[in-house]
UniProtKB/Swiss-Prot annotation:
Binding site residues for substrate: R55, Y190, K196, R317
Job of this protein: Involved in the gluconeogenesis. Catalyzes the conversion of oxaloacetate (OAA) to phosphoenolpyruvate (PEP) through direct phosphoryl transfer between the nucleoside triphosphate and OAA.
Protein source organism: Deinococcus geothermalis (strain DSM 11300 / CIP 105573 / AG-3a)
Protein family membership: Belongs to the phosphoenolpyruvate carboxykinase (ATP) family.
UniProt KW Cytoplasm keyword: yes
Subcellular compartments: Cytoplasm
Gene name for this UniProt entry: pckA
GO cellular component term of the entry, any: cytosol
Gene Ontology BP term (one): gluconeogenesis
Name of the protein: Phosphoenolpyruvate carboxykinase (ATP)
Keywords attached to this entry: ATP-binding, Cytoplasm, Decarboxylase, Gluconeogenesis, Lyase, Manganese, Metal-binding, Nucleotide-binding
CDD domains the UniProt entry points to: PEPCK_ATP (cd00484)
Residues that hold ATP according to the record: K196, H215, G231, L232, S233, G234, T235, G236, K237, T238, T239, E280, R317, T442
Root EC class: lyase
Amino acid sequence: MSLTQTPLLQDLGIQNATLHHNPGVDELYAAALRRGEGKQAATGPLVVHTDKTGRSPKDRFIVEDDLTRDTVWWGGFNTPISPVVFDRLLDKMTHYAEGRELFVQDVFAGTDPQYRIAVRVITEMAYHSLFVRNMFVRPTAEELEHFQPDWTVLNIPSFKADPERDGVRSETFILVNFTRKMILVGGTQYAGENKKGIFGVLNYLLPQRGVMPMHCSANMGEDGDVALFFGLSGTGKTTLSADPSRRLIGDDEHGWTDTGVFNFEGGCYAKVIHLNPEAEPAIYRTTQTYGTVLENVVLKPDGTPDLNDGSLTENTRSAYPITQIDNIVPEGRGGHPKNIVFLTADAFGVLPPLSRLTPEQTMYQFISGFTAKIPGTEQGVTEPQPTFSTCFGAPFMPRHPGEYARLLAQKVRESGANVWLVNTGWTGGQYGEGQRMSIQHTRTLINAALSGQLDNVKFEREPFFGLEIPTEVPGVPKEVLNPREAWADKAAYDRTARKLARMFRENFKRFEDGVDPAITASMPEHREA
């Protein structure tokens, strides 16, 4: 169906383009191969290599106007631009797009009809259109007949900005305009910008409607009990939420309403570097399936994907519809969470493997969003480096973290959900001295928490962070439960714990003006021994 005469494209100013409206998988494969965008692996997936191999958070801008001036938390990842800059780049992009071949997908962001937004994504690359089709919620044929977009994404990677003339940082740009309900993307082929751009939009819009947007995975037990898993990269979020005894609601983005949780997406965008087919069989199968997009995966001479080759990037990805996973909740919705798990990989080795959080600690840990990077090969880096990403997703959160924390605390109070902090990092010493937390112990602890096994267990409070630790969990040695007991040198543990507590306090200073005093009162400095 041609879109050349629709009001939308007239509004955009794109003339004489060859448009493919809601093309299917076969058509998009054919177009991507014809245009030289990628290759089809012998096992079926479309394999593409991109100029940028990750997101460009420093090139993301939000239009500052009357709507956003006092509602966006400016600074950090939220950089303002003027409406004039946006309009000028939009004009240049639409003229650049004239006469080109473009692909249009009409999709929903959100599985809950009450809160979803309708999104029209116009892309220069066929593979981006397949990515969008895989990742978002696909409307029914009837819904497509009456589709009216709330938001428009225009993504033209070959259009590169002139930083000096166009008022942006580099040739790459991601511009979000909440007043005009548009996202412009240029100068990058990385498909994740389509997904995370709309995630940021939902993270801005939904709190106004009392919905908590979350960067987390979600699954459901046999009895319908829902669990959420928050965690930064490398904490085990994907592995630990992929439980054969629980059905997957979604792996990355969710909203929490007055009735329960819903997935923002209709697909998954999984990291696949060194993916183990025995440890992650469901995700591995998707990397061998027709319809999947494999991003920056290297092909072997026989045309099969080499998931162990990170020569292009360690950030190799598989984008596939969630329906390719067998053990899912097909409607992408569930009730109120019974348990919430914050995952952290503490390379300092001082946080407990599992602790129970109070409502105030929940807000504090959520705003902090802590994990730690291990020392690399960089000269002079000999100790773990703390990483704080507020709300476990700082690049995607336009509002003040205090807003999200208050909303989460309200939802936790109303639902009575248990909140757990789980350390998947080090024990018995920091990185280089201790050992990585046993995945079996972590699974045992999480299963005990989700099953209600810990409801009647005695807890003790550790002195440095005020965290409540279970004194006994079947299958986990007692000396593992209390991190101080796992260290041979108790004085070294105390020094390291105080050091990490100071890092938490220092990081939290930038949030204190926008959070409740009760959160500040739960800070480690009030517990320091």
